[in-house]
């Protein structure tokens, strides 16, 4: 597939998604929302997939947990992969399960050598179960953790090298983390291994409603201008990559999302001459 820009598929936009004839448009879904045996949601995704490529962006495998991924979850994900043939499957660099309990968030962890070994094992298990390469997304961070042995870019690069996985770069996450933890987002993005980047996410953020100086990765606002600037800088270095406009809260009409998507298409077109191709 020629890299272009897509949208997160929302139930209120099923009809628009099926009817839209925009060139190169694709849609991303959270597979956890489609793991039922049937029903109207799966039927709608079938109708969209008949016209458009789709990607599956998981939120529930808890790859940074201290246990193996849940085998039943992996089996359900494999059934969706077989059914919809997504052009990308991705997951988060985070944990959300511990001692049998599930936490409804994507939580951080100390980037130790032991954590790298454990997560490499879990990513390998995911790829083996799905029989395909997956992409792993960088997290959004809010407070410093003690115990880091590796910086985040080095951790991600080692993960990609050891497992053969690719990277999903969420530019908004990079900006939010950089603002909250006090580093330059440009330095982070410039250090990422271009060959490993298989997809990019763009989303909105907001100030902490509690009044702190933190930024929160809300997915509830348009992509900020500073994130667009960082995105253009990244594309100028690495060349075009499939790019998603993420919106999970305060969702506007389809036309407003398409306007953001079309802006991403223009940035991708400007990066066609970059020299570092993706290995997706």
Curated annotation (Swiss-Prot):
Taking the record's annotation, the residue ranges forming a coiled coil are none
Entry annotated with the keyword Transmembrane helix: no
Which InterPro entries does the entry link to?
MbnB/TglH/ChrH (IPR007801), Xyl_isomerase-like_sf (IPR036237)
What follows loss of this gene? Answer: Not essential even when cells grown in the presence of its inducers dichromate or cadmium.
NCBIfam families in the record, alphabetically? PRK05409.1 (NF003818)
**Organism expressing this protein natively:** Caulobacter vibrioides (strain NA1000 / CB15N)
The leader peptide range reads none
What causes induction of this gene?
Strongly induced by potassium chromate (K(2)Cr(2)O(7)) and cadmium chloride (CdCl(2)), but not by inducers of oxidative stress or thiol such as H(2)O(2), paraquat or diamide. Induction by Cr and Cd requires sigF. Probably part of the CCNA_03363 to CCNA_03366 operon.
Q: Which family does it belong to?
A: Belongs to the UPF0276 family.
Keywords of the record, alphabetical order, are: Stress response
Q: What is this protein called?
A: UPF0276 protein CCNA_03364
């Amino acid at each position: 597939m020629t890299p272009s820009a897509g949208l997160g598929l929302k139930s209120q936009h099923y009809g628009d998604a099926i009817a839209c004839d925009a060139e190169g448009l694709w849609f991303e879904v959270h597979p956890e929302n489609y793991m039922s045996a049937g029903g109207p949601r799966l039927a709608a995704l079938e109708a969209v997939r008949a016209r458009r490529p789709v990607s599956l962006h998981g939120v529930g495998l808890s790859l940074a947990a201290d246990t193996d991924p849940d085998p039943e979850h992996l089996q359900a994900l494999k059934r969706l992969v077989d059914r919809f043939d997504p052009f990308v499957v991705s997951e988060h660099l985070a944990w959300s399960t511990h001692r049998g309990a599930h936490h409804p968030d994507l939580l951080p962890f100390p980037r130790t050598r032991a954590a790298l070994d454990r997560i490499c094992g879990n990513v390998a298990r995911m790829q083996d179960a799905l029989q395909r390469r997956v992409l792993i997304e960088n997290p959004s961070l809010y407070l410093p953790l003690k115990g880091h042995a590796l910086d985040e870019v080095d951790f991600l690069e080692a993960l990609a090298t050891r497992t053969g996985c690719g990277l999903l770069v969420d530019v908004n996450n990079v900006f939010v983390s950089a603002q909250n933890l006090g580093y330059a987002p440009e330095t982070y993005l410039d250090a990422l291994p271009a060959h490993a980047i298989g997809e990019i996410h763009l989303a909105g953020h907001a100030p902490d409603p509690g009044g702190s100086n933190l930024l929160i990765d809300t997915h509830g606002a348009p992509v900020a201008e500073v994130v667009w600037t960082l995105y253009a800088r990244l594309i100028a270095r690495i060349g075009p990559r499939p790019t998603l406009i993420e919106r999970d809260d305060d969702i506007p009409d389809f036309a407003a999302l398409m306007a953001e998507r079309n802006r991403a298409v223009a940035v991708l077109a400007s990066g066609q001459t970059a020299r570092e191709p993706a290995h997706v």
